[in-house]
């Protein structure tokens, strides 16, 4: 009798979980219709196992979300001894491109350290600092090689900033899929890709990101620990990737959206709405 009772409870739990995942899907489809948007979402656990998703295998432009794995590559080089965080990277005015606040601030000195550039790329989405790091690691091809090294066979970087943000429909360059990027996040933060010191630093940077207050974290409960890296590009691209801790469980998440008919503020609100849909799913399945 106890065995039958346990089976009944398991069946009820499975049915409830399936119902919540269906609600998750229908809520995202409703957002897509209302906003004339395409929304890609992947949520995985620390092992990279799928929790939920929508358009998980569809390619989207990475936009600036690649700056998080770029920073991870920089930390890997530091961990292995092939790079030093305090090494000064010299540059001139030619490194100043659109949206380079930290690069402009350090221009008078003629250099930034490796860690200063990496932090600016993650927390400010500084394009000049990003290109400076790409110069040092060997260009976009080296970034793609790192993706492959950590098990991501999908994500690719082909150009530097700002060209990589063109987001031309049908162009495979500089793209990823939600599931590929979510698993890359999980690999970096939970899979031992970096030393504990480097992992802690990059987590702290993501939590202190200055470009994402209106996106995913705006849709998550205030008591969740959230760290993320946003991305914005042409033709309505607005993205957010990172991690969150909810009810003592860790998750990696990737959200990619294309909404060319919306304003910049409305695109932020769209990503925040996706965060609310994710919240509903997590709270209902973690009971």
Curated annotation (Swiss-Prot):
Binding residues annotated for a beta-lactam, in chain numbering: 67, 125, 161, 232
Disulfide cross-links: 63-233
Listed result of changing residue 98 to K: Increases catalytic efficiency about 25-fold, with respect to ceftazidime. Increases resistance to ceftazidime about 30-fold, and to aztreonam about 20-fold, in DH5alpha E.coli strain
GO biological process, one term: beta-lactam antibiotic catabolic process
Signal sequence, renumbered to the chain: 1-18
This protein's UniProt keywords: Antibiotic resistance, Disulfide bond, Hydrolase, Plasmid, Signal
Catalyzed chemical reaction(s): a beta-lactam + H2O = a substituted beta-amino acid
Top-rank lineage group of the source organism: Bacteria
GO MF annotation: an example: beta-lactamase activity
E.C. no: 3.5.2.6
InterPro entries with a match to the protein in the record: Beta-lactam/transpept-like, Beta-lactam_cat, Beta-lactam_class-A
Miscellaneous comment as given in the Swiss-Prot or TrEMBL entry: The class A beta-lactamase family has a specific amino-acid numbering system, sometimes called Ambler or ABL numbering and often misspelt as Amber. A multiple sequence alignment was used to derive a consensus sequence and then the consensus was numbered taking into account insertions and deletions. This allows use of identical numbers, e.g. for active site residues, despite differences in protein length. UniProt always uses natural numbering of residues, hence there appear to be differences in numbering between this entry and some papers.
NCBIfam families recorded: bla_class_A, blaGES
Function: Extended-spectrum beta-lactamase (ESBL) which confers resistance to penicillins, as well as first, second, third and fourth-generation cephalosporins. Has ceftazidime-hydrolyzing activity. Inactive against the carbapenems, imipenem, meropenem, ertapenem and doripenem. However, weak hydrolytic activity with respect to imipenem has also been reported.
Subunit comment: Monomer. May form dimers.
Family: Belongs to the class-A beta-lactamase family.
Protein name: Beta-lactamase GES-1
Native organism: Klebsiella pneumoniae
Lineage, top ranks: Bacteria, Pseudomonadati, Pseudomonadota, Gammaproteobacteria, Enterobacterales
């Amino acid at each position: 009798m106890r065995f039958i009772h346990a089976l009944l409870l398991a069946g009820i739990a499975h049915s409830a979980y399936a119902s919540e995942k269906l609600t998750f899907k229908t809520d995202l489809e409703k957002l897509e219709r209302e906003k004339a948007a395409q929304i890609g979402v992947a949520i995985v656990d620390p092992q990279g196992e799928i929790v939920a998703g929508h358009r998980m295998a569809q390619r989207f432009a990475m936009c600036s979300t690649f700056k998080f794995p770029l920073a991870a590559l920089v930390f890997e080089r530091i961990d292995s001894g092939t790079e030093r965080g305090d090494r000064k990277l010299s540059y001139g005015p030619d490194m100043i491109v659109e949206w380079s606040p930290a690069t402009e601030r350090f221009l008078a000195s003629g250099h930034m350290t490796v860690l200063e550039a990496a932090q600016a790329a993650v927390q400010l989405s500084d394009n000049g600092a990003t290109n400076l790091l790409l110069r040092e690691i060997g260009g976009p091809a080296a970034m793609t090689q790192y993706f492959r090294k950590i098990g991501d066979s999908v994500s690719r970087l082909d150009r530097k900033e700002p060209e990589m943000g063109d987001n031309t429909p049908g162009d495979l360059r500089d793209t990823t899929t939600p599931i590929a990027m979510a698993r890359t996040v999980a690999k970096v933060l939970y899979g031992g890709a970096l030393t504990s010191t480097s992992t802690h630093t990059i987590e702290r940077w993501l939590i202190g990101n200055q470009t994402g207050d209106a996106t995913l974290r705006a849709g998550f409960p205030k008591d969740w620990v959230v760290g993320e890296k946003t991305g914005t590009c042409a033709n309505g691209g607005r993205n957010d990737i990172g991690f969150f801790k909810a009810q003592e469980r860790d998750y990696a998440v990737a959200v990619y959206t294309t909404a060319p008919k919306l304003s910049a503020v409305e695109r932020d609100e769209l990503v925040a709405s996706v965060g609310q849909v994710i919240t509903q799913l997590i709270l209902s399945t973690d009971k």
